[in-house]
Design a protein with these regions (language model features):
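Non-catalytic beta/alpha edge segments that cap or flank active sites
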Residues: 1-78
Length: 78
């Protein structure tokens, strides 16, 4: 149930697809997430596909968590 008395606040979301086989043309899960985010009137200006390497995943998430313009990080794949 949505509480209508609370004003809407747009959040900025980063989507990270973790895959060794996908690119921006073939990443269906990333595309779905971005579409759903925008349909709910939130922002997704940060989208990246990274390799399925644990060190790279940790590094990327740490970097994005330090970005003051990103409120939420969503990962898919892996």
């Amino acid at each position: 149930m949505i509480n209508e008395s609370i004003p809407f606040k747009q959040i900025n979301i980063s989507v990270i697809t973790i895959s060794d086989t996908r690119n921006k043309d073939t990443d269906k899960s990333g595309a779905y997430l971005i579409k759903a985010i925008k349909e709910k009137k939130h922002s997704c200006e940060d989208y990246e596909i990274i390799s399925d390497d644990p060190n790279n995943i940790i590094k990327t998430i740490k970097e994005k968590s330090l970005n003051k313009n990103i409120d939420v990080i969503i990962t898919t794949g892996g």
